[in-house]
Structure formats: C-alpha cells, structure tokens
Amino acid sequence: MKIYGLIGVCVLVWGCTKQGSRNTEGENNPQEITEDTLAYEAEKHLKNIRQLTFGGDNAEAYFSFDGSKLVFQAKNPAWNAPCDQIYVTRTNQSWKDSIPPLVSTGNGRTTCSYFMPGDSTIIYASTHEGNINCPPDPPRGAKYVWPIYSDFEIYTADLEGNIIQKLTDREGYDAEATVSPSGDKIVFTSTRSGDLELYTMNIDGSDIRQVTNELGYDGGAFFSPDGTKLIFRSSRPKTEEEIKEYKDLLAQNLVQPTNMELYVCNVDGSDLNKITDLGSANWAPFSHPSGQKIIFCSNHHSLKGGRPQFNLFMINLDGTGLEQITFDRVFDSFPMFSPDGTHLVFSSNRNNGGTRETNLFIADWVE
C-alpha cells in the first residue's frame, strides 16, 4: 500500500523534526498529553489516547501476536530515513527524543510490515535489492497517482534487521503482505497476472494461489479474526473511460487511489461481496474483534469543493450501521485492534502543531 498517497490528497505530510539522539531504549510510558488535546469530544469509543511518535510521517502500525509490540513504517529525516523504513516499538514506549530500533535494511523504500508467528520475526516489502536509494516519486500532474514500484519484493527479517528469507522473487510488484491470525497464511498484492490482484501463500512462501481476478487495484487485505475471510479495498473501474485510464496508468506502474470501496470474500476468493458504496476513497479496513464489523478510513463525508477529510468509520459486513469513530479535521487512518480487542492503534495528524506530521496513537477501545 502506498502509505502516504491518500494523506497527500488532503495535505502534504512530508514533515521535518529536530535531530534526535540514537537512543533505542525509548521512553517507557508514552508522554501524557491532556485528553482534550488528543481526543475529540465525539470520540466515544476511544479512551486514554497516548501518542507514540512525535515527528515525521508514521503509519501502518500493527500489533504483535501477543499484543506487546508494534511494527510500523516511518519517513523521518531526523531518523536518517528519507523514505519509508520499518521500525519496532513496545506499546508502552514513545519516541519524542529518541529513535526506535530499525528492523529493515535502511536501503531502498519499504512498506507494509507485519509480525510473523512467535513475534521474533517480521514480514515486509522492500525495493532495496533493485536499488539501495529511495525510488523516485511520480511526477505531480493534474491527477493524483500512487507509484507501483516493480522492485518491491516481500522478505522476512529478525528484529535486529537481518533478512531471513525472500518470499517473492519475480518481475513486478509484490507487497502489502499481512499474516493470518493462526500464523499459517500470508495474503499479499501482486502484478504477476498483469493486474493488481490478491494472492495467498503459506508462511514459508510456498503454495501461492490467486484470490481475486477482476480488473482493478485489489490491495490492503487483512484476514478476519477467524482466518476464513479477507477484507480489502479495490478501485474496480467499470466504464470504458475508467478502464482505459486504469490500464494506461498501470502500464506506467501507476494507480489513481481516489475512488475505492471495501470488499469481503472467503480466503479462496469465493463469496465475494461489496461492503461499502460510499464513493470517494474507502480504505485501510481491519476487522472488529467480533468479526461482524470492520473499521476503516474514508473521506466520503468531506465537503464538496473543500479539503478532503479522512476519518475512521465502523460498518457491519453487510454494509449497514455506518458509524463515524474519529473526528480529526485532516487525517485519521490505518486502524488496527490489538489481538485481545482492548486497544486501537492508528495514525493521525492530530496534535501536530499545525505541521504536516503524521504520528502514531494508541487508545483503549470502548464498545
């Protein structure tokens, strides 16, 4: 997933921070900032919000299987990360004046990290074997696009940053990998069919199977709590004009992410159903612990002609019961529930002093 693409639709988030010391011990007990600063009055499902990062662009923080750690990606010049790299933190640490442990190579660009079973290794995608430098951003034009870097491959690594295994090794884009709750399967997005489709594989990279086969950018997939279903977002162009534009952009390794809806299917791709029909960009879905609802990011409620506003929403799998969860005026996204369902981690532009920084926050979840 192109992490900061949709943030860029509403505001450029390339932030800058003061240089921090290389202290990977962190600060136990995240710095307390008043609840009034971190929470909006209408955020009734969130309690005791705590800020974990304090500068740069931090996103896609995902819990370890035991719920004690988070792995996330960040772009932060103060951390010597000019483009996204992968870091790990304990949930009771914060990183205001120090730098978290780097667990990617520090080369190329990375995306979409996730813990593997046992919590001593992670999975993530990286371009470092294709080029150790940050890949170029796409040119800014009349339309907003995400790059689909063909150098992205999927790797496993230990928490010291050592590559253990390369799980994919073929021409084209392989990224956006997440792991099933039982730890036996991986779902990811690939262009190996000529389109951006979902695939599954065993935890060791074997038995790769195609899941989706309709034209469009299928990505950002997660398993349901019982591991039987996949939830994901897709662009799914329909009209002749939309199809042509999608294919033309994909031929340039680009996609336009401004119109996406959410879908659910069985792990083998059967029983595919569309969950949302809200228009605009609906993405970053994650299952509620009950397995009957999903939390996701959307800008469908933005005022026409105004700046897009991205917030978290909850919806039933059948598309009913839409409820707004967060209310930042610019950006809330990348939600994930802890394995026991008691906490929610997410990224937000709140409490950034009017800068373009996106930080990580963790909160107690209140039903």
What function would you assign to each model-found segment?
Residues T34-D57, T89-R109, A157-Y173, I203-Y217, ...:
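Multi-bladed beta-propeller domains
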Residues K2-G8:
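Sec-dependent signal peptide recognition
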Residues F65-D66, P117-G118, P181-S182, P225-D226, ...:
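Residue-level detector of Asp-centered blade-edge/turn motifs that repeat once per structural unit
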Residues W14-G15:
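C-terminal motif of bacterial Sec signal peptides marking the signal peptidase cleavage site
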Residues L70-V71, I122, I186-V187, L230, ...:
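Hydrophobic beta-strand positions that form the internal "hydrophobic ladder"
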Residues F54-D57, A74-I86, S104-T110, A125-E153, ...:
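A flexible loop/linker signature enriched in serine peptidases of the S9 family
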Residues R22-Y40:
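Sequence/structural signature of beta-propeller modules
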